[in-house]
Structure formats: structure tokens, C-alpha cells
Amino acid sequence: MTPTNIEAIFDRSLPQSPDAERCVLGSLLLTAFLGVNVLTRVSSIITPDDFAQDSNRAVFEAILELDADGIMADLVVVKQRLRDKGLIDRFGGGAYVSGLV
């Protein structure tokens, strides 16, 4: 491969899958509901910038913030955090977050 072809590979945008993003978030919310915290492992692989959809990025950031505060990020707590930040109505309200699980 010539250098130009290699550069072209890295200039392409990554594939996006809103469904996969929602599945990751739903899994995090469900495991928190069960009292299991898998966020440490997930956050070593996925960052907020990996989410193409702003709504999903906001939910993931809320989960990370809650975890940093020592709070288990279940569905109810995440919705409240987004409400407190004035973000929940930007992407469909609590119904959107509830729909992740």
C-alpha cells in the first residue's frame, strides 16, 4: 500500500451504530440495577467521544460522573442527573433513557 492509500484509511470516519450505542448504555444501566458495576472495565475501552449520537454521549457522561461521585448509576439516578444538568429534554426526556433498557 502506498502512503497515500494508508492516509486515506485513517481519514475515513468510523462506522456508527446508534443501536450498538444504546445496547452498551442499556447494559450499563441494567448491571447497575442488579448491583454490578462493570463501568471500570467498559470505560477502559469506550470513551464519551466514541458515541456518535449526542444523546447517547450525554447518558454515558452522566454514568461516568455518577460513578466518579461513588453513586451506582441505575436508570432512576441517571435520569435525575440528566434532569439536574438540563439535558434530559434535549433528546426525548426520561422516555428515551428508559427505552435504553
State the predicted function of each range.
Residues 1-101:
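Noncatalytic partner-interaction/assembly domains of nucleic-acid and motor enzyme complexes
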